[in-house]
A protein has these predicted regions:
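Well-ordered alpha-helical segments within folded domains of soluble proteins
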Residues: 55-72, 115-132, 165-179
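Asp-box/WD-like beta-propeller blade repeats and closely related beta-sheet repeat scaffolds
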Residues: 106-117, 140-165
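N-terminal glycine-/serine-/threonine-rich beta1-alpha1-beta2 phosphate-ribose binding loop
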Residues: 63, 97-102, 155-159
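Low-complexity, Ser/Thr/Pro/Gly-enriched N-terminal "stalk/linker" regions
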Residues: 1-59, 77-104, 137
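Hydrophobic core segments within long, regular secondary-structure runs in both alpha-
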Residues: 20, 24-27, 64, 80-91, ...
Length: 185
């Protein structure tokens, strides 16, 4: 977890809580029945191929976050390998300038359907979750580079105001990237 000197509250770290009974059984069922069976590479392909399809990029980050949390909880070696491989794949997709998007350059930071920043937020969330699990300096660097890249496109003019991105509600869905972007500060 990234902590700042001004933080006063923190989440419990991995391994601080152990469950038993039905809750533990359900967690292990999710690991075996979903997280170990999902093709994470296929989900990363949306970033690799920049097909600009609405909200396709959110799923890698959501599943990566879940996999990292459950990997920390269970200590499952097979799930850890999946998580490590998927993080390496996603970091390999990221361009040197920090771009990690499902949208072609010419359509960023919006995309045809407005989900570009929403999808970047989930990629960032997945990579941050991996950093919290692994302590990988490369993962943290990938996060910082993605935030910096996004900051070149979104903000005060001549950049695009974040309230002019997204698909509804004056950019509220795009603005959800802002909290995660605090790593850049």
């Amino acid at each position: 977890m990234i902590r700042h000197s001004t933080d006063r509250q923190f989440s419990l770290g991995a391994g601080c809580v152990r469950l038993d009974g039905p809750a533990d059984s359900k967690i292990r069922l999710v690991c075996e029945g979903t997280l170990k069976r999902i093709d994470m590479r296929a989900l990363a392909d949306y970033f690799r191929n920049t097909a600009d399809q609405f909200a396709t990029g959110e799923f890698w980050g959501k599943l990566m976050r879940a996999a990292c949390m459950l990997c920390a909880y269970t200590g499952d070696a097979d799930l850890r390998r999946i998580v490590d491989d998927s993080a390496a794949d996603m970091m390999g997709i990221q361009r040197p300038d920090g771009c990690l998007s499902t949208v072609p350059d010419a359509l960023q930071p919006q995309g045809t359907h407005g989900s570009d920043l929403w999808e970047r937020k989930y990629a960032l969330m997945g990579l941050l979750s991996y950093y919290e699990l692994s302590g990988s300096a490369a993962a943290l660097d990938a996060c910082v580079r993605l935030v910096r890249y996004t900051n070149t496109q979104v903000g005060d003019p001549p950049r695009t105001p974040i309230t002019e991105t997204g698909w509804a509600f004056c950019g509220i869905e795009s603005s959800s990237i802002l909290e995660l972007s605090l790593i850049h500060i």
